[in-house]
């Protein structure tokens, strides 16, 4: 996909939550291949931007386009929502499902591929984030770091309903908060590797200076 392809556009976008204006006439465009970092003090609306792109919130005013499509409905109300993938600070794995089932959850739900093909895709995604022989384990059998890697593997699963030209947007919300410097570096490397492997673009919200510097090629204040 050409680098000049616009993946996301916010135009004069504002968000009001009650009497509080969280975002005021934001203008932001993201192009294919970009890795953005959004920085600012607590309460400045960084996570609100992620919620908008994820389809969990609608703007009060202005426009939001993803892959050229106007976003007028919440994600759950769309028949074909945009390819947006979230990686939370908490891995958010389902404790009752194995690693294989957690990573392949979307594909199992869509029922497009056979179990054998889903398994192959899941194993490939796990290997890309450095995980081997864990597919049949449950989340509570893994270390915290391994659980986080599973959440990255899950973000590599492509929506079977999207075409080959679809450009996924990966959202990382405070991915290195509370980690020691060594763990921080590992996750930062994983953010870059995962975004490149998904052939997508990314937005990182973080207060950690090394994460901002290492994972972004453009910083939004």
What does each model-identified segment do?
Residues 165, 170-173:
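Catalytic Walker B motif of ABC-type/P-loop ATPase nucleotide-binding domains
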Residues 71-85, 109, 115:
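ABC ATPase NBD coupling module
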Residues 39-41:
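The feature captures the beta-strand-to-loop junction immediately N-terminal to the Walker
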Residues 138-142, 146:
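Conserved ABC ATPase signature
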Residues 116-134:
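Conserved ABC ATPase "signature" region
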Residues 54:
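Helix-to-loop junction immediately C-terminal to a conserved catalytic motif
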């Amino acid at each position: 996909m050409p680098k000049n392809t616009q993946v996301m556009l916010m135009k004069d976008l504002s968000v009001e939550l009650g009497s509080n204006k969280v975002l005021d006439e934001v203008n932001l465009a993201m192009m294919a291949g970009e890795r953005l970092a959004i920085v600012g003090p607590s309460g400045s609306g960084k996570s609100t931007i992620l919620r908008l792109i994820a389809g969990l919130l609608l703007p009060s005013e202005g426009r939001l386009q993803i892959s050229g499509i106007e976003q007028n409905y919440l994600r759950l109300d769309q028949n074909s929502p945009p390819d947006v993938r979230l990686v939370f600070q908490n891995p958010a794995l389902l404790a009752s499902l194995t690693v294989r089932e957690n990573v392949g959850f979307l594909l199992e739900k869509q029922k497009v591929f056979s179990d054998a093909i889903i398994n192959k895709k899941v194993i490939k995604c796990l290997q890309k984030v450095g995980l081997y022989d864990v597919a049949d384990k449950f989340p509570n059998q893994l270390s915290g770091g391994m659980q986080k890697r599973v959440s990255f593997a899950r973000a590599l699963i492509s929506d079977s309903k999207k075409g080959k030209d679809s450009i996924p947007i990966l959202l990382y919300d405070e991915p290195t908060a509370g980690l020691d410097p060594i763990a921080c570096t590992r996750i930062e490397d994983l953010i870059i590797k995962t975004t490149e492997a998904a052939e997508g673009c990314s937005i990182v919200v973080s207060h950690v200076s090394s994460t901002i510097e290492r994972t972004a090629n453009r910083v939004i204040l």
